Curated annotation (Swiss-Prot):
Pfam entry (one): DUF188
Family: Belongs to the UPF0178 family.
InterPro entries per the UniProt record, alphabetical: UPF0178
Originating organism: Rhodopseudomonas palustris (strain ATCC BAA-98 / CGA009)
HAMAP family in UniProt: UPF0178 (MF_00489)
Official protein name in the record: UPF0178 protein RPA2191
Amino acid sequence: MTDALTRIYVDADACPVKDEVYKVAERHHLPVTLVAGGFIRVPQHPLIERVAAGSGMDAADDWIAERIKPGDIVVTADIPLASRCVKAGATAIAPNGKPFTEESIGMTLAVRNLMTDLRSTGEITGGPRAFSPRDRSTFLSALDSAIRRIARRRAAPT
């Protein structure tokens, strides 16, 4: 079992791996907070909390970033939110299982900004590739690994 201080935050609007988060969180007895701009349906479970952060442009992102702390995990595809959470000392994982780290977040943010600019000029059309079963599997593995890594760090003598 992992220290109850670890909380999993989910940037829940359009997150394709909510069910996977529930399963892993239940296995490790970790609380989950799903944050969305509006109402979302979540299972009735004592470890699962739903937050409707409001309809502002970045309301859900701001809500998460203001509360996340070292040892917490955020699941998000939003690169600026991931950057804010990593800077706060949290672990950030994309729904496809890709971890956002201190070493990678700067380049990831720069590529995201470049792609946004290229799309706005019409140089690139379309979006990301479709979410696959392999992405789901990679995510499950990444989330489980992150939880175990945090638990080891907390258990290590200081």
